[in-house]
């Protein structure tokens, strides 16, 4: 259901390369001026011109603490991506705030509902968002039903057992809404399910399969060396096993790598030399080499995509919960001094073909 030409999707090409640009609107409002080769540049256009074909964006239900990642902000982001010639992956968090492989806090409006009520709410919300995007001419090409759903959807936490009857009901409700919207609006939309860190993929999808979660097109994996026990070879083995066992495409849908240990502000950075992989120095060249080798690993093992997380989360005067600036500026794809596009963007334009095993 995926095609390398934007915005419509058709047959699957060898590879999707892209980035999550959920921060761009906010960074620009905070005063960030992005450059490419020293000239003013739009990050969406930079992504496209360097060889990318897909943009990912997150959506929160009712984030009263911010005006970003709301429906209106996401509509603006998707519109910018499509205008730049990019396809769009819409990431439903099904939450009012960040959810990830540690926690899946439900939206406040759904927190006290029983499973049947939550399934209806999740289905209807998903369908409503997609119907509104269709009316605006901005349907995404791919939809994530949940973000890093290692714990149970709508309430689970790391280490807690998953009630798979409930979890399957919720996941299938979201999947059904995407399928219905796709049919109603006459546009193919691929469904992705997303798990953090490769070591968790096979156990989770085995459980999901046994519980009847079967109707999806893409397996998305977050891969960060800081939080994974696996090197690139280990990641490759998981990708190979997953696409063979489940018959789905497999993407590394989140990844990043630091290019410096320097700080541009007082926020503690999440990545750096403490999470570097052997052979990949924390430098602009090391960042580029990591992305090239990661993508080659994906391709060699039958995978279909790599998406960089938050290349646009640069340091600005704005405050976050963690301090002024960014916790990621040293792992962005724009430099700290001038927000000029880094050499790592060239990873997007390289030709990748599977190597014989």
PLM feature spans:
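N-terminal signal peptide c-region/cleavage motif recognized by signal peptidases
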Residues: 3-7
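Aromatic-rich peripheral "rim/lid" segments of glycoside hydrolase catalytic domains that contact
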Residues: 29-35, 241, 260-293, 297-302, ...
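Conserved, mostly hydrophobic/aromatic
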Residues: 19, 47, 91, 143, ...
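Active-site cleft segment of glycoside hydrolase catalytic domains centered on the general acid/base Glu
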Residues: 70-73, 100-210, 214-216, 228-237, ...
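Acidic (Asp/Glu)-rich catalytic clusters
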Residues: 12-13, 42-51, 76-87, 131-139, ...
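Glycoside hydrolase catalytic-domain groove-lining segments
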Residues: 43-45, 180-190, 199-275, 292-300
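Active-site beta-loop-alpha junctions enriched in small/polar residues
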Residues: 22-24, 60-62, 93-97, 145-150, ...
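N-terminal substrate-binding region of glycoside hydrolase catalytic domains
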Residues: 12-87, 93-122, 220
């Amino acid at each position: 259901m995926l095609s390398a030409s934007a915005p419509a999707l058709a047959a699957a090409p060898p590879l999707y390369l892209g980035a999550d640009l959920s921060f761009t609107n906010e960074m620009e409002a905070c005063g960030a001026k992005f450059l490419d080769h020293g000239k003013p540049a739009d990050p969406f256009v930079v992504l496209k011109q360097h060889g990318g074909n897909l943009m990912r964006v997150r959506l929160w239900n009712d984030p009263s603490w911010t005006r970003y990642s709301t429906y209106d902000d996401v509509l603006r982001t998707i519109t910018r991506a499509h205008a730049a010639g990019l396809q769009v992956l819409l990431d439903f968090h099904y939450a009012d705030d960040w959810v990830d492989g540690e926690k899946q806090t439900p939206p406040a409006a759904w927190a006290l509902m029983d499973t049947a009520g939550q399934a209806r709410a999740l289905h209807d919300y998903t369908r409503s968002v997609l119907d509104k995007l269709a009316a605006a001419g901005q349907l995404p090409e791919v939809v994530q039903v949940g973000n890093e759903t290692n714990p149970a959807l709508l309430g689970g936490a790391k280490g807690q057992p998953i009630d798979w009857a409930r979890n399957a009901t919720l996941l299938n409700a979201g999947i059904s809404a995407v399928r219905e919207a796709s049919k109603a609006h006459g546009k193919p939309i691929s469904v992705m399910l997303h798990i953090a860190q490769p070591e968790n993929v096979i156990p989770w999808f085995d459980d999901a399969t046994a519980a009847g979660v079967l109707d999806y097109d893409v397996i998305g994996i977050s891969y960060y060396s800081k939080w994974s026990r696996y090197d690139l070879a280990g990641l490759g083995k998981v990708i190979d096993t997953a696409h063979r066992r489940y018959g789905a495409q497999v993407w590394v849908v989140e990844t990043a790598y630091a290019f410096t240990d320097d700080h541009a502000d007082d926020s503690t950075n999440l990545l750096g030399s403490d999470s570097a992989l052997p052979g990949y120095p924390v430098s602009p060249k090391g960042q580029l080499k990591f992305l090239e080798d990661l993508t080659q690993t994906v391709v060699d093992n039958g995978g279909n995509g790599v998406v960089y997380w938050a290349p646009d989360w640069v340091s600005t005067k704005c405050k976050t919960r963690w301090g002024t600036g960014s916790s990621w500026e040293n792992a962005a794809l724009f430099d700290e001094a001038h927000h000029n596009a880094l050499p790592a963007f060239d990873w997007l334009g390289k030709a990748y073909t599977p190597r014989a095993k």
